[in-house]
């Protein structure tokens, strides 16, 4: 299950109590105070990691708690500190205060780690209160409570390539071809109900780091106003380095590729205008359904209407044109 938003109550550990104790040894009948301090409560930290792509493992959790500090002991022994809790999250996670909406941190790199809830300080034992005028203090203090915070975690996927298109444009088929994997494919809208992630290996470069590709669920007209799957997944487009628009050029499932492309670009810009600055490629898919003359005719019409866009003819089903797309990825993603 893909989970990209959760709310959690985070509870840091309570500090251990300080204690009142006395030094009792045979040759020290008036040994004085000997009570130790309490241990500090454990803190809650959040750390971004690679190879984690959703909050699925936390979907049934409502709160997380770090360990409490232990009480001090006689012989001036300090209690053991409570164990910290480190919450692992995917790169691309936004951390917000659920009550104020304040952005606490944006996790963009592997290994980024911050303290979100500080553990409570341990209390002081009676040794701490010994002075020249008070040689036998009977005072000790309790440990401080740990911080409690209600937070929201929201994921915006960080991917090299984001596949964007209408339902039934053939995105999932193309995704399977590029990533050499299998996501669900079907001849009905919204086959993809959550983003799928795959790796696209650079052809001829076995030891190069592969590109991360995200298949974004199908966009419909009005997605920027939260129609269809709407805003739930439009946010995942924001952090992709390259947008690959997948448009059905065959005219079988959808009658007008020109209108489709106009709506797709319009919805993205309505959601966030600065997406226009992203690198884009238009993949005209399902050319296996057309004769060569038909392909070129429809391509020419699209180029006329969208002169600033870069187009490529391909078939996710047969693989035709995919090698050219690989070359485009290499040139665009190395810029």
UniProtKB/Swiss-Prot annotation:
GO terms for cellular component: cytoplasm. Residues 1-158 form the Obg domain. Mg(2+) binds at residues 172, 192. It is found in: Cytoplasm. Its EC number is 3.6.5.-. GTP binds at residues 165-172, 190-194, 215-218, 285-288, 315-317. One of its GO terms (biological process) is ribosome biogenesis. InterPro entries: G_OBG, GTP-bd, GTP-bd_Obg/CgtA, GTP1_OBG_dom, GTP1_OBG_dom_sf, OBG_GTPase, P-loop_NTPase, Small_GTP-bd. The keyword GTP-binding applies. Its cofactor is Mg(2+). Residues 159-334 form the OBG-type G domain. It is an enzyme of class 3 (hydrolase). It comes from the Bacteria. Gene3D superfamilies: GTP1/OBG domain (2.70.210.12), P-loop containing nucleotide triphosphate hydrolases (3.40.50.300). It holds the Pfam family MMR_HSR1. The keyword Hydrolase applies. Monomer. Belongs to the TRAFAC class OBG-HflX-like GTPase superfamily. OBG GTPase family. This is GTPase Obg. It comes from Chlamydia muridarum (strain MoPn / Nigg). The lineage of its organism: Bacteria, Pseudomonadati, Chlamydiota, Chlamydiia, Chlamydiales.
């Amino acid at each position: 299950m893909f989970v990209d938003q959760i709310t959690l109550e985070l509870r840091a550990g309570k500090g251990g109590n300080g204690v009142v104790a006395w030094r009792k040894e045979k040759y020290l009948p008036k040994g004085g105070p000997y009570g130790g301090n309490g241990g500090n409560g454990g803190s809650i930290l959040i750390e971004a990691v690679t190879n984690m792509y959703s909050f699925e493992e936390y979907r049934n959790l409502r709160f997380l708690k770090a360990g409490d500090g232990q009480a001090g002991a006689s012989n001036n022994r300090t209690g053991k500190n409570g164990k910290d809790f480190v919450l692992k999250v995917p790169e691309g996670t936004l951390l917000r205060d659920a009550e104020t909406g304040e952005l606490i941190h944006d996790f963009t790199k592997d290994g980024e780690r911050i303290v979100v809830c500080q553990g409570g300080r341990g209390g002081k034992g009676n040794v701490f209160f010994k002075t020249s005028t008070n040689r036998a203090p009977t005072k000790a203090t309790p440990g401080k409570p740990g911080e409690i915070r209600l937070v929201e975690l929201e994921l915006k996927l960080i991917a090299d390539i984001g596949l964007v298109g209408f339902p039934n444009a053939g995105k999932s088929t193309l995704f399977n071809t590029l990533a050499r994997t299998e996501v669900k494919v079907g001849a009905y809208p919204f086959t993809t109900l959550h983003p799928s992630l795959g790796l696209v290996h650079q052809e001829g470069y076995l030891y190069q780091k592969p590109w991360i590709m995200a298949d974004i669920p199908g966009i419909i007209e009005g997605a920027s106003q939260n129609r269809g799957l709407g805003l739930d997944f439009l946010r995942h487009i924001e952090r992709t380095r390259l947008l690959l628009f997948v448009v059905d050029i065959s005219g079988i499932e959808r009658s007008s590729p020109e209108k489709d492309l106009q709506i797709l670009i319009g919805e993205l810009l309505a959601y966030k205008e600065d997406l226009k600055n992203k690198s884009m490629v238009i993949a005209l898919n399902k050319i296996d359904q057309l004769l060569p003359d038909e392909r070129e005719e429809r391509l020419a019409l699209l180029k006329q209407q969208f002169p600033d866009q870069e187009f490529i003819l391909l078939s996710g089903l047969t693989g035709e044109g995919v090698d050219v797309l690989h070359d485009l990825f290499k040139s665009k993603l190395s810029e």
